[in-house]
Curated annotation (Swiss-Prot):
Endonuclease that specifically degrades the RNA of RNA-DNA hybrids. Monomer. CDD domains: RNase_HI_prokaryote_like. This is Ribonuclease H. Residues 1-143 form the RNase H type-1 domain. InterPro entries: RNase_H, RNaseH-like_sf, RNaseH_domain, RNaseH_sf, RNaseHI. It catalyses: Endonucleolytic cleavage to 5'-phosphomonoester.
Length: 148
């Protein structure tokens, strides 16, 4: 059986300042890659979504399955439950309001269709090595922008 790519993502925001960061740890066999980035005016949910988008954009082949782990219930519930209805309702919520972060959700939708992704929720700060690494990368990205 072919190994699957394992991805851990995390996003965060120091919302009193609006500074946000995201982190990604990709692992495939002995290969691993770490990615991180930041934005000056953002939200926690946008950073969580951005982390998953950046991770999936990094995967060039659609021939290998992906196990994607995130501590964001917003991302997990959105991708597994809400998105189907949003698309039927032309990206409106059940209360007929525009979906927040629709630009990112639409990008994630395209990427999710291009890959065989199994989505997993992992509890944050629970000594999960992959989640801890992604969290550390997101915080390093926020620290970098805080110091500049």
């Amino acid at each position: 059986m072919m190994n699957r790519i394992v991805i851990y993502t995390d996003g965060g925001c120091r919302c009193n300042t609006g500074i946000g960061g995201w982190g990604v740890w990709l692992k495939y066999g002995d290969y691993d890659k770490k990615l991180k980035g930041n934005e000056k005016k953002t939200t926690n949910n946008r950073m969580e979504l951005t982390a998953t988008i950046k991770a999936l954009e990094e995967i060039k082949s659609n021939q290998i399955g992906i196990d994607l782990f995130t501590d964001s219930k917003y991302v997990i519930t959105g991708i597994n439950e809400w998105m189907k209805n949003w698309k039927v309702k032309n990206w409106e919520t059940s209360k007929k309001r525009p979906v927040k972060n629709v630009d990112l959700w639409q990008r994630l939708d395209v990427l999710n269709k291009q890959h065989d992704v199994i989505w997993y929720w992992v509890k944050s700060h629970s000594n999960n090595k992959g989640n801890d690494i992604a969290d550390e990368l997101a915080n390093l990205a926020m620290d970098k922008i805080s110091l500049s």
